[in-house]
Amino acid sequence: LQQCGINAIMFQVRGEADAMYPSPYEPWSRFLTGRQGTAPNPYWDPLAWMITECHKRGMELHAWINPFRAKTKGTKELALNHPYVKHPERFFEYDGLYLFDPGLNENRRYICQIAADIVRRYDVDGIHMDDYFYPYPVAGMTIPDQATYITHKNGIDNVDDWRRYNENLFMEMMHDSIRAVKPWVKFGVSPFGIYHNVQPGSNIPGSNTRGLQNYDNLYADVLYWINKGWVDYNIPQIYWEIGHKAADYEELIKWWSRFAGGRPLFIGQDVERTVRAADLKNPQRNQMSAKFGLQRGLRGIQGSCLWYSAAVVRNEGNYATALQKNYHRTP
């Protein structure tokens, strides 16, 4: 990755209220040892190791946490020190997932406490969060947070507005929690690639797209966070192809550049989808060159973030070679 000119790594250290480091609050991750709560043997600290190895190479290390997801469908057993085991009343279940209820202030405080602990004990360059806030909608299902809404509505009469309010409170609290410990540590987010589909009569900025929406479906008002200065960088996941009928890459990067270019903006790239999609003008080539050309022609965009690193290391579609010889040949 260093040879490809990559200057920062987002390393996921908390996927489901667990830890890829020794945490005083949450259990070791099953993704590390095979069983949640079981420490690695021989013992090691993956986060500390990643920080050391990245910094030796002049690369930043951002600790990537998933804030509200507490259990995925694949997890069959929870450790005794898992937050859900201790306080099941603070969670709701949705489509096989357990999630911290964002409407509860004790949950927002707790997650910020986790991030502050990482920042305090480790020399991380940033705290990073991706696109998981309220759950992605599933047809025929409703989020079971009505009881929380009734008791914590704070005078907000619309449940959608209330959910966005909860996320706004959380993002401000997370920003402040990090700043209170180490003001130089960055706080970044990588939201879903569509903020809002343009709609007649709507005063909410929207792109010419027809897909799931941050604002309406995930209750993530990303533009508000950016305008408030709560996030230091923004990496919208624009994983679609140029020419995609519902979510065109070109349309979306231009939209984000226009509306979110006032803060550091990087484009989330799906390496595998990029190299598998044919260039619209030259079908013998993939879309890597066209995508880089489009984004580098927009003043508000400062670079790319690649999903995911293994595809780069495998040099799928000669992506790594192109980075080394062309796009990242010089800093």
PLM features per residue range, with description:
Residues 125, 130, 147-157, 207-208, ...:
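Aromatic- and acid-rich polysaccharide-binding/catalytic face
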Residues 47-52, 63-121, 216-220:
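Active-site-adjacent "subsite" loops/lids of carbohydrate-active enzymes
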Residues 1-19, 121-126, 224, 228-234, ...:
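Catalytic domains of carbohydrate-active enzymes, especially glycoside hydrolases
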Residues 19-34, 69-95, 131-154, 200-212:
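Aromatic- and acidic-residue-enriched segments that line the glycan-binding/catalytic groove
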Residues 8-11, 15-66, 72, 151-181, ...:
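Aromatic-lined substrate-binding rim segments of carbohydrate-active enzymes
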Residues 55, 60-72, 128-132, 160-215, ...:
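Aromatic-lined carbohydrate-recognition surfaces of secreted/lumenal glycan-active proteins
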Residues 219-245, 260-331:
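Substrate-binding cleft of secreted/luminal carbohydrate-active enzymes
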Residues 26-44, 94-112, 155-167, 210-211, ...:
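The substrate-binding groove and active-site-proximal loops of carbohydrate-active enzymes
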